[in-house]
Amino acid sequence: MEDDFKHLVRISRKDVDGNKTIEQALTEIKGVGISLSTTMCRTLDLDSEAQIGYIADEDVLKIEEILENPQKFNIPNWMLNRREDYETGENIHLIESDLDMTLRDDLNRMKKTRSYKGRRHEAGLPVRGQRTKSTFRNSSSVGVKRS
């Protein structure tokens, strides 16, 4: 059984440590949390506590297929990280660099439309209504410095 062990497993453009459990290893992929990794293990009938270095190549391909199209495998929409996409209106799940680019595009769209959230992002201030009297003083916001 030692011959089948892989120290690095490549899943969706990400090298994952083979010594970790399947559940933990899947959470190393950006865009995959613990609930999605648990659901993926249950969908594929994999032991979530087994080391990912021992799983077969076919199972790795199935994991990648679930990450590409989770709705095909009846993953609920509330587990997806991009529900009702702004441009397409579809429910999709993004991982790794696709997630980064989409979030950056969303921020740029908010800044371009000069929405409240966009202006707060531009100024480097908190966006979600936190108080700023005593906190966020060391952030890199643009302002006047006293000498």
Swiss-Prot record:
One GO molecular function term of this record is: rRNA binding
Q: Which GO terms describe its cellular component?
A: cytosol; small ribosomal subunit
Sorted alphabetically, the keyword list is: Ribonucleoprotein, Ribosomal protein, RNA-binding, rRNA-binding
One Pfam family it belongs to: Ribosomal_S13
Alphabetical GO biological process terms: translation
Function recorded in the entry = Located at the top of the head of the 30S subunit, it contacts several helices of the 16S rRNA. In the 70S ribosome it contacts the 23S rRNA (bridge B1a) and protein L5 of the 50S subunit (bridge B1b), connecting the 2 subunits; these bridges are implicated in subunit movement.
Q: Which gene encodes it?
A: rps13
Instruction: Check the record and name the SUPFAM superfamilies matching this protein.
Output: S13-like H2TH domain (SSF46946)
Name the record gives this protein: Small ribosomal subunit protein uS13
- InterPro entries registered for this protein in UniProt: Rbsml_uS13_C, Ribosomal_uS13, Ribosomal_uS13-like_H2TH, Ribosomal_uS13_archaeal, Ribosomal_uS13_CS
Query: What Gene3D superfamilies is this protein classified in?
Result: 1.10.8.50, 30s ribosomal protein s13, domain 2
Give the organism the record lists: Methanobrevibacter smithii (strain ATCC 35061 / DSM 861 / OCM 144 / PS)
* Domain of life of the organism encoding this protein: Archaea
State the oligomer form and interacting partners. Answer: Part of the 30S ribosomal subunit. Forms a loose heterodimer with protein S19. Forms two bridges to the 50S subunit in the 70S ribosome.
Chain spans, region Disordered: 115-147
